[in-house]
């Protein structure tokens, strides 16, 4: 049974995209009225090793917008995380497919982080791993661009999980 108000952001290794998405989403939810501002956000990776440090470029990209993720360590996506979430927000279709192939029964509350943007050129957020800082900043900006439509979706979701 889902715990009302828990959201999981998912990428591959949980060291670049999903920690940035987690921090950005926490920041956005904190500015919302209850119940959204009390919702919990965690991140995980479909191929993560537990305890890996967050990418330095992810730390720098978020520091530039006033968010600190330097203490983040990776965790693998688990059945418990999925079962306790009202929404699992993936960075790519391949992450969604991997979850659908890995977990039985297949969770139905899996979405792309940018899925709710009606005019987005791409619904996916590419992996900046190993790239220069500007690629991490572009990744961050794609997430920031998705936040307003994601907030609208989460408001609708909140009204259903009361």
Give the role of each language-model region.
Residues 2-84, 152-161:
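Conserved active-site segments centered on acidic
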Residues 18, 92-93:
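Helix N-cap/beta->alpha junction signal
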Residues 9, 89-90:
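Hydrophobic beta-strand core positions in alpha/beta domains
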Residues 4, 87, 93-162:
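Phosphate-binding/catalytic loops
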């Amino acid at each position: 049974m889902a715990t009302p108000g828990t959201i999981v952001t998912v990428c591959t290794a949980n060291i670049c995209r999903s920690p940035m998405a987690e921090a950005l989403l926490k920041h956005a939810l904190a500015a919302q009225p209850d119940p959204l501002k009390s919702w919990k956000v965690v991140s995980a990776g479909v191929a993560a090793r537990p305890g890996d440090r967050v990418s330095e470029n992810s730390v720098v990209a978020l520091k530039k917008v006033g968010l600190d993720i330097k203490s983040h360590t990776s965790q693998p996506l688990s059945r418990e995380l999925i079962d306790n979430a009202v929404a699992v927000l993936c960075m790519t279709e391949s992450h969604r497919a991997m979850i659908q192939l890995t977990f039985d029964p297949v969770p139905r509350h899996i979405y792309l982080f940018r899925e709710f943007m009606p005019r987005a050129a791409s619904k996916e957020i590419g992996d900046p791993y190993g790239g220069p800082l500007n690629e991490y900043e572009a990744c961050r900006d794609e997430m920031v661009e998705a936040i307003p439509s994601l907030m609208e979706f989460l408001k609708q979701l909140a009204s259903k999980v009361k």
